[in-house]
């Protein structure tokens, strides 16, 4: 079971949901993983009740599948499902990037994004990729938050939750290739220049390129599988 932080304060179900959400976004659970309420409750240091509430919410969102009694399953993702998610993600995240470019932003916000981007590039160069996906997610959502549309950001997060378990499949082969052309750098430059078309184009290209790589990992049944090392 992936290590999860113990929960010390109320409301327990909300914190359990946040922890599970963050773990899924970070790709810490492989597709097919069975999450039992008891093991999750033990990790959190809570009773089963708040964990059940959190898992029920994620099942209702389509992020997890209902498993055998008192459990849930991290779903596999098919090439077709990935294609559908990519269409939606490109539309939503492209729009968020466009809106971010059309707004004025303070120096502190832009500086944080530049620092995050620099960290991502350093991790790639050093091939220290254990924390790359976390920085990658925070970079993307840093841009989307700049759109000033919280509902849009929330909807984007729901899409990421659905594809989170396979995002780690891009480590290490695909991520290392990002040294060739960096859509992240180009997107940030476009936002800083107020180039809405450029920002949207680069974010959409980033999503599409990664999806193309992930689609190539599908097995004969169309299910995405982690590449063999």
What do these predicted regions represent?
Residues 102, 125, 192-193:
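Alpha-helix C-terminal capping/termination sites
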Residues 20, 96, 100, 143-147, ...:
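Hydrophobic recognition helices of helix-based DNA-binding modules
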Residues 17, 21, 25-26, 41, ...:
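Solvent-exposed, non-membrane alpha-helical residues enriched in polar/charged side chains
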Residues 11, 108-111, 175-178:
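Short helix-capping and inter-helix turn/linker motifs at the boundaries of alpha-helical repeat units
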Residues 1-102, 211-229:
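Short linear motifs at protein or domain termini
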Residues 43, 174-229:
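C-terminal regulatory/effector modules of DNA-binding transcriptional regulators
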Residues 85, 107-168, 182-186, 198-208:
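Conserved amphipathic alpha-helical segments that form helical-bundle/coiled-coil interaction surfaces
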């Amino acid at each position: 079971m992936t290590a999860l932080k113990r929960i010390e304060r109320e409301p327990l179900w909300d914190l359990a949901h946040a922890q599970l959400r963050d773990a899924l976004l970070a790709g810490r659970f492989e597709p097919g993983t069975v999450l039992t309420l008891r093991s999750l409750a033990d990790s959190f240091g809570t009773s089963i009740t708040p964990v059940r509430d959190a898992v029920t919410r994620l099942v209702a969102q389509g992020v997890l599948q209902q498993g055998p009694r008192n459990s849930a399953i991290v779903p596999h993702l098919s090439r077709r499902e990935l294609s559908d998610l990519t269409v939606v993600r490109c539309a939503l995240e492209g729009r968020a990037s466009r809106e971010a470019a059309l707004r004025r932003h303070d120096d502190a916000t832009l500086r944080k994004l530049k620092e995050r981007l620099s960290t991502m590039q350093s991790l790639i160069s050093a091939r220290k990729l254990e924390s790359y996906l976390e920085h990658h997610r925070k970079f993307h959502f840093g841009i989307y938050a700049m759109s000033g549309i919280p509902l849009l950001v929330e909807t984007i997060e729901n899409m990421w939750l659905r594809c989170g378990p396979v995002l780690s499949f891009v480590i290490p082969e695909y991520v290392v290739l990002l040294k060739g052309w960096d859509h992240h750098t180009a997107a940030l430059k476009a936002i800083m220049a107020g180039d809405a078309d450029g920002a949207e184009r680069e974010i959409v290209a980033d999503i599409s390129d990664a999806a193309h790589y992930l689609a190539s990992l599908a097995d004969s049944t169309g299910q995405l599988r982690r590449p063999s090392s």
